[in-house]
A protein has these predicted regions:
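Short, flexible loop segments at the rims of nucleotide/cofactor-binding pockets, characterized by
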Residues: 7-12, 61-64, 149-153, 188-192
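Soluble, non-transmembrane catalytic domains of enzymes that act on hydrophobic metabolites at membranes
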Residues: 57-59, 72-78, 141, 152, ...
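Conserved beta-strand hairpin/beta-sheet module of binuclear metal-dependent hydrolase folds
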Residues: 1-50, 163-177
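Active-site HxH/HxHxD metal-binding segment of metal-dependent hydrolases
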Residues: 38-40, 48-135, 234-239
């Protein structure tokens, strides 16, 4: 699937767990997240068979956060094709130390559970948990090679979440900030920092973008995205259900929880 804008085309690659977005310009391509480690082959096949361009034309991979279906393929794509990787400046703290090692294993375990629930065949999921970004991103920073895009720091799902904003096209790649589950717009799993994610939703609502690229939900063109983000804040007030509680309990071993004073 592809969606055309005035200066680029957005291709949707259906990954093992999440949608991966490839932004095609005449002079290069931008990959929004790298999917799972087993999605490298899917990205390769899409570029060769659909876009008809070599993977070396991808100038930058932006990793929105460290979960397996977003960061899993980054190291492999950089090693194989020399593609630069950008991510939040503190992203490698997420899986650092013994707690981070345990968190990495648990996140891969939970990701496999999601794939199984989606009736996917079992595939390799483990990936090296440190990405050493070539470019460290901070809030409101323009992307290297693609200065028409800005990175926005939107913590709450993890501490290092970033979304990508294209002001001219009123377009947002929101990664996991909202998940479309059977037509219902829901909070991500987990929400590790409710106050921070509430502030993040306020930030995103203020942009009133007309198009959302969702890692779990596809491309959404809407008249009022502000209302959608504000409705997520209302969901934060509801008591967590058993699944939310379980995922939260399995997601608190990263040393970033203590470092952030949570």
């Amino acid at each position: 699937m592809k969606t055309s804008f005035s200066s680029f085309t957005v291709h949707t690659i259906e990954g093992y767990i999440s949608s991966i977005y490839l932004v095609e310009y005449d002079d290069g391509m931008l990959l929004m997240d790298s999917g799972c480690v087993n999605d490298v082959k899917r990205i390769e096949d899409y570029c060769k068979q659909v876009v008809n361009r070599p993977l070396g034309d991808i100038k930058l991979i932006v990793v929105s956060h460290m979960h397996p279906d977003h960061a899993g393929g980054a190291n492999a794509l950089r090693s194989k094709y020399g593609i630069a990787v950008a991510a939040h400046k503190d992203v490698d703290l997420w899986y650092s130390g013994l707690g981070g090692l345990l968190q990495h294993k648990l996140d891969c375990y939970m990701a496999m559970g999601v794939a199984q629930k989606n009736k996917r065949k079992r595939e390799h999921m483990l990936f090296y948990p440190i990405i050493h970004p070539d470019f460290l991103l901070d809030d409101l920073q323009a992307l290297p090679f693609f200065e028409d895009w800005a990175a926005l720091h939107t913590p709450g799902h993890t501490m290092h979440d970033i979304v990508l904003y294209h002001q001219k096209e009123s377009l947002l790649y929101i990664a996991d900030m909202i998940c479309d589950v059977k037509g219902k717009m829901l909070l991500p799993l987990p929400v590790l920092a409710p106050p921070q994610i509430e502030n993040s939703y306020d930030k995103l609502a203020s942009l009133n973008s007309s198009t959302l690229l969702m890692a779990h939900g596809g491309v959404k063109q809407m008249e009022d995205t502000s209302a959608l983000f504000l409705s997520m804040k209302e969901q934060l007030k509801r008591p967590p259900n058993p699944i939310m509680r379980k995922v939260y309990r399995l997601s608190t071993f990263t040393p970033e929880i203590k470092r952030q004073g949570m």
